[in-house]
């Protein structure tokens, strides 16, 4: 975009300068109060050295930080463009706040100007023309390109602005905190060329000075007309360029529409894929939950089996202890049996059997004696029926038994069988005669 400057405004500006043409100190005071513009880049504090140099060396107290932002290409999708634009805008605001903080720390006032245009250098030139900028500080190159021998501009933007900027603007080009070069304003040398140095000037000298200033004014007017014509040519060029850009934009919109259709198709496929993936994940989660439940149940069964096994082992140990006790008792019974047999051998056939041969339940001689948990011996079939009827107590002492296991009393059964055989022999007459 090209800014057209009317000739009347240029004449007005020249007339204002002429009113201060004689009083040099007052003019210098005005220059000190002018705003100094500092162009910064989008990168984080990349132009910090230029701003610090301007504050320390320009002598100004009011500064204007110029941030030129290049818009996002039009061929990008609308949503992507909006997100990227917001991101870049937030980044620019944060970067500008850092520059303002530097100004506050160095005790100077400053403001921020945002310019959005396709060309950084053209945006700065537009600002110079619109605001009548007279002092500008910008980078000659990135700080990383600085060297002690650096004397020329490296940045293409700086070279372009050095060549195309209005002649009324004084520009300092810095790099890494050092002044590389400057472009002096042309009017600064013309305004004071014929200024008087004392209060004793003659009328003719004043007249000649005035004529010189008028000539300078004519020169500035011609310069303004030339710049205005150049601006017209540039405007026509920009119009043609804009038409081409509009045509390119239409083509880009068509292409964007095609890509948008492709995008929505891919979005649809992605949603279907995500739906299938969620379904598969739900199935896997269900299988995992069922597996965990089965594992938990298995652990519970194993724990119960372990408890039963421990209980069985305790019962087995108890039975073994009881068997040991029964063996001791059986040995004692065997001794008593031997004595009894000796006594019974000499007794008559009508003698009653020993009391420990009689079952406490049936009151008959036992054929299959078994020892219960209470330590008493019973007929195996009789004590089994006792337990089958639901009894859990001892038939003899009526106390609850710790278990219903039975141990065969082999020694007692042998003694009973021997007693029965002996009694049978004693009952035979021939046997008695033989004895």
UniProtKB/Swiss-Prot annotation:
GO terms for molecular function: ubiquitin-protein transferase activity. GO terms for biological process: protein ubiquitination. The keyword Cytoplasm does not apply. CDD domains: RING-Ubox_WDSUB1-like, USP_STK_Ubox_N. Keywords: Coiled coil, Transferase, Ubl conjugation pathway. InterPro entries: Rossmann-like_a/b/a_fold (IPR014729), U-box_ubiquitin_ligases (IPR051348), Ubox_domain (IPR003613), Znf_RING/FYVE/PHD (IPR013083). It comes from the Eukaryota. This is U-box domain-containing protein 36. It comes from Arabidopsis thaliana (Mouse-ear cress). The gene is PUB36.
């Amino acid at each position: 975009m090209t800014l057209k400057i009317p000739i009347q405004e240029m004449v007005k500006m020249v007339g204002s300068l002429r009113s201060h043409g004689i009083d040099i100190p007052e003019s210098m005071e005005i220059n000190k109060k002018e705003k100094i513009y500092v162009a910064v880049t989008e990168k984080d504090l990349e132009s910090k050295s230029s701003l610090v140099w301007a504050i320390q060396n320009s002598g100004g107290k009011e500064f204007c930080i110029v941030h030129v932002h290049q818009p996002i290409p039009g061929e990008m999708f609308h949503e992507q463009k909006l997100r990227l634009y917001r991101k870049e805008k937030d980044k620019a605001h944060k970067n500008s706040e850092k520059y303002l903080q530097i100004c506050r720390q160095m005790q100077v006032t400053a403001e921020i100007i945002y310019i959005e245009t396709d060309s950084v250098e053209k945006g700065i030139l537009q600002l110079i023309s619109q605001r009548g900028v007279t002092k500008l500080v910008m980078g000659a190159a990135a700080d990383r390109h600085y060297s002690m021998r650096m004397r020329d501009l490296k940045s293409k933007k700086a070279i372009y602005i050095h060549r195309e900027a209005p002649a009324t603007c004084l520009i300092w080009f810095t790099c890494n905190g050092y002044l590389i070069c400057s472009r002096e304003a042309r009017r600064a040398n013309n305004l004071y060329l014929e200024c008087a140095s004392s209060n004793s000037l003659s009328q003719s000298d004043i007249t000649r000075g005035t004529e010189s200033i008028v000539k300078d004014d004519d020169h500035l007017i011609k310069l303004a007309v030339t710049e205005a014509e150049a601006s017209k040519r540039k405007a026509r060029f920009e119009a043609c360029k804009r038409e081409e850009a509009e045509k390119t934009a239409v083509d880009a919109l068509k292409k964007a529409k095609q890509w948008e259709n492709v995008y929505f198709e891919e979005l649809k496929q992605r949603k279907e894929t995500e739906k299938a993936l969620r379904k598969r994940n739900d199935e896997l989660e269900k299988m995992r939950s069922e597996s965990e439940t089965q594992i938990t149940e298995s652990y519970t069964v194993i724990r119960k089996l372990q408890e039963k096994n421990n209980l069985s082992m305790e019962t087995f140990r108890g039975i073994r202890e009881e068997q040991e006790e029964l063996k001791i008792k059986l040995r004692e019974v065997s001794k008593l049996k031997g004595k009894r047999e000796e006594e019974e051998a000499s007794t008559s056939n009508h003698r009653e059997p020993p009391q420990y041969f009689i079952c406490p339940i049936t009151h008959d001689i036992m054929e299959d004696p078994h020892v219960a948990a209470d330590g008493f011996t019973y007929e195996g079939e009789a004590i089994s029926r006792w337990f089958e009827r639901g009894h859990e107590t001892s038939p003899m002492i009526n106390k609850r038994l710790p278990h219903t296991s039975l141990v065969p009393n082999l020694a007692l059964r042998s003694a009973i069988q021997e007693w029965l055989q002996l009694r049978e022999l004693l009952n035979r007459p021939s046997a008695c005669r033989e004895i």
